[in-house]
Design a protein with these regions (language model features):
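Non-catalytic RNA-recognition surface used by pseudouridine synthases
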Residues: 1-83, 89-218
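Single conserved hydrophobic/aromatic residue that forms the stacking wall/gate
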Residues: 219-232
Length: 232
């Protein structure tokens, strides 16, 4: 069952206008499609599939060391226990970090209910929590605990097994899924917590096009020219 308030940004059709008769003066630089791998890696974004365990900063550090880059950042923190899409911005691309972090996100999570709840009541709660919501960051967070406005574009009820509820959530950047599960539990008057979480999308980057650190290491060693093909 799907509860949708509005279409997520990445599903909105966008068109790019191209002047076919235009030419770029070679003195301004190289054709993007003909740039050497060294230049591409000086301003690229790598879509990394973060495993559970390491911090987001540790992933960024590993990528920086592997590529021999001067700096690397990430497009939105994932807690150590959370896996999934983590865009890593390299060198010049770090200037775009804020734009990537503000992009929409999509997660798949397991919410654990603390009591018995009917399907009807659960669906009522999920519908209520779509659209614009108010949210206070969790106690353990890196930002000040003041009320913020966030948008839940869509909540999809994928599966339910007793008190375990599998959800796919599309939301605006800065949404705390852990707090969302807790707030749903408060509304249901039984309590709930986020048991497991995976990020499946961050802006234009999805898990279908993500590479693990092992993938990146093997490509860097055996097929370095492919790095330009998997970067953005």
């Amino acid at each position: 069952m799907i509860f949708e308030a509005e279409t997520p940004p990445w599903e909105i059709e966008r068109r790019t206008l191209v002047r076919l008769d235009a030419e770029t003066d070679p003195s301004y630089g190289c054709d993007p499609y003909k740039r050497p791998i060294e230049k591409l890696l000086k301003a690229c974004v790598l879509n990394i599939d973060k495993p559970r365990g390491p911090t987001s900063h540790e992933i960024a550090f590993t990528v920086r060391e592997l590529l021999g880059a001067e700096q690397a950042g990430h497009g939105g923190t994932l807690d150590p226990a959370v896996s999934g899409v983590l865009p890593i911005l390299v060198d010049e691309a770090t200037k775009c970090a804020e734009a990537v972090m503000k992009g929409g996100k999509e997660y798949v999570c397991v919410m654990r209910l603390h009591g018995e709840v009917s399907n009807e009541k659960l669906e009522e709660a999920l519908k209520l929590f779509t659209g614009e919501i108010y949210q206070v960051p969790p106690v353990r967070s890196s930002v000040s605990r003041r009320i913020r406005t966030r948008t839940i574009y869509r909540i999809e009820l994928l599966e339910r097994d007793g008190r375990n509820v599998l959800l796919r959530i599309a939301c605006s950047g800065g949404t705390y899924i852990r707090k969302l599960c807790s707030d749903i539990g408060l509304y249901l008057k039984c309590g709930a917590h986020m048991q497991e979480l995976r990020r499946t999308r961050a802006g234009p980057f999805s898990e279908e096009t993500a590479y693990t650190l092992l993938d990146l290491s093997l490509i860097h060693i055996s097929e370095p020219t492919r790095l330009g093909m998997i970067s953005y």
